[in-house]
C-alpha cells in the first residue's frame, strides 16, 4: 500500500516488497502501475519479476520513499512533515495534487493547460489573497 500514498516516510529498518510472483499471482492494488512511475519501467520489472526485498535505503535511493529516519524518530518526522504541509493553503494543496495526478500521464502541452486552469482557479480565493498579503507584509500566511 505504500505506493498509494502521496509522501512516503519510513524507518531505517523498514523492508518493502512486491512478493506476488513468489506466490504464483500478479501484483495487485495497482502496484504494477504505480511502481514504474516511481522507479522506471526496467527497474520496476526487476523488482516485480524477482520478488526482491528492498531495504529502506534501497527504496529511498530508487525514489520509492521520500525520507528514511531512525525508528525512534519516525513519528516526529511524520508530524513535522504533516505540520509543514498543514501550514499551507489546503485548497491550493488539493488543487496541486489534482493537477499533478491528472497531468502526470498527459502530453506536456496538455499538462501545461491543466496547470494554467488550476492556477487561474486560485486567484481571488481567500487563501490566495491571504498568501499574497502575507508575502507583501513579510509575515507567515494564516490560512483557514
Residue ranges and their predicted role:
Residues 1-49, 62, 77, 81:
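CoA-thioester-processing core
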Residues 4, 50-52, 126-130:
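Short acidic-aromatic low-complexity motifs
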Residues 9-14, 56, 65-113, 120-121, ...:
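C-terminal long alpha-helix characteristic of the crotonase
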Residues 31-34, 43, 55, 95, ...:
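Hydrophobic alpha-helical segments typical of transmembrane helices
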Residues 47-51, 96-100, 135:
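Short alpha-helical scaffolding segments that buttress acidic/His motifs in well-ordered protein cores
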Residues 52-58:
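Acidic, divalent-metal-coordinating active-site segment for phosphoryl/phosphodiester hydrolysis
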Residues 133-144:
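Terminal low-complexity tails and localization/encapsulation signals of metabolic enzymes
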Amino acid at each position: 500500500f505504500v505506493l498509494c500514498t502521496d509522501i512516503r516516510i519510513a524507518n531505517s529498518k523498514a523492508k518493502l516488497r512486491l512478493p506476488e510472483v513468489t506466490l504464483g499471482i500478479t501484483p495487485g492494488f495497482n502496484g504494477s502501475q504505480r511502481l514504474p512511475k516511481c522507479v522506471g519501467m526496467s527497474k520496476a520489472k526487476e523488482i516485480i519479476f524477482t520478488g526482491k526485498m528492498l531495504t529502506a535505503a534501497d527504496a529511498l535511493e530508487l525514489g520509492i520513499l521520500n525520507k528514511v529516519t531512525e525508528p525512534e524518530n519516525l513519528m516526529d518526522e511524520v508530524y513535522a512533515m504533516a505540520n509543514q504541509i498543514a501550514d499551507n493553503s489546503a485548497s491550493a494543496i488539493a488543487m496541486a495534487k489534482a493537477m499533478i495526478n491528472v497531468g502526470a500521464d498527459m502530453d506536456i502541452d496538455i499538462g501545461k493547460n491543466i496547470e494554467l486552469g488550476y492556477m487561474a482557479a486560485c486567484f481571488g480565493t481567500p487563501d490566495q489573497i491571504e498568501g499574497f498579503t502575507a508575502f507583501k507584509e513579510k509575515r507567515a500566511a494564516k490560512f483557514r
